[in-house]
Amino acid sequence: MPQWLPRGKPSGGQAIQSSKAFRMTTALTRKHFLQGSAAAMAAALVNPQAALAQPIAATTRSHAMSLTPNWDKTFAKSAKVDHRKVTFSNRYGISLAADLYLPKNASGRKLAALAVCGPFGAVKEQSSGLYAQTLAERGYVAVAFDPSFTGESGGEPRNVASPDINTEDVSAAVDFLGLQPFVDRERIGVVGICGWGGIALNAVAVDKRVKAVVASTMYDMSRVMSKGYNDSVTAEQRAQTLVQLSRQRWLDAENGSPAYGPPLNELKGGEAQFLVDYHDYYKTPRGFHPRAVNSNGSWTVTTPLSFMNMPLMTHIAEIAPRPLLLIHGEKAHSRYFAETAFAAAAQPKDFMIIEGASHVDLYDRMDKIPFDAIAAFFDKSLNRPLP
C-alpha cells in the first residue's frame, strides 16, 4: 500500500485497494444496465434519463459571455477560501468561464494548482466546484471550469461535446494556471469527474506539463457512446446508429441549426437505479443548476458522432511515469470503465474502491469522497511543501 494512502479502513466506510492488491475483474453484473442499440446508448448518455496578484483573464470574440456575480453554487461557500470568477481561452479560440479557488493567507508563496472539471453535462457550480473548493481548503489553487459550448463558457452552437475540444479545454485550464504569479507551474495536477475522468486521462496523456491526475467515478464517454453499457451494442447496431446520425447532419444543415434531444434525467417509472440516481442529483435541490445540460437542457442529437469515432483511452499508458489515481464506488454501475482504464495504464497507478458508494455518491457526498486521500496523493505527487 502506498505511503500516502491511509492505513486500514478510513472514516466514512472507504475501502482502499492498491495497485498491487487490486484484482481486476471484468465479469461485472449487468443487472439494471440499459441494453439495446447504440442509439439507445447515445440517448442514455447524451440524453440520460440529463491578497494575491490578480489572475490573468483572456476573452475571445466568439461568444458574448456574461458571468453571474452571485454565489449560485449547489454547495455552501467556504470561509477558508477566496473565490473569484475568471475567464481564459482554449487553443480553438473559445472563451471558457471558470471559478478560481485560492486558500486564504497564502503568504505570497507559489502554490501547487489543480484543474477540475466534470461531470459530463454538469457545470462548475456543481460537483467540480465542490471538489475545487474543498481542495483549496487543503492548500491548493484550484480552478473549476465550464467546458466549451456549455454553462457560462463560449462556443456555438450550445450544448455540444467533443472529445478533441473538451480534451483541449483541460489543457487550456493548465495554460491559465501556469500563467498565474501565485502558481508553481511545475506543480500542476488535474481532477476529472464522471465523463470528465476519461477526458482528463486523455488530456494528461498528451499534456506533459501535468504532473499527476485523479479520475473520480470515471466514464469513458467514447466507449459508452460507441458500444453501449457493458459493450452490449453489436457492430450492426453501431452502424445503424451512425447512419441515423449522419443523415441527421443533412437535417441540421437544412435547418441552419442543430436538433436537440428530449429533456434529460426525467423519470417515467421503471428506470434502472443509476438513472434514478442521476435524477436525484440533477433534478432536485441537491444538485440542480439551471445552466447544467443534465439539469435543464439536452445535448445536440449529433453529439455522439465524434465520440464514436475517437476513442479516449488509446494513449493513457503515456501518462506514466506521472502518477495516476482512480477512485470509484463499490456499487457504481460505471465501475468497469475504471477497471479497464486501470488495466491499460502503466505504473505508477492506484485504484481506490469506496465501500458502499454508487456512481453519483462521488459527486457530492462528503462522507464518501476521499478528499484526505486525494490531497495526500497530490501532496506526494506534486511535492507540495507543508505550510
Language-model features: locations:
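Conserved alpha/beta-hydrolase
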Residues: 136-152
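N-terminal secretory signal peptides and thylakoid transit peptides that target proteins
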Residues: 22-40
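Catalytic histidine-centered segment of alpha/beta-hydrolase-like enzymes
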Residues: 357-367
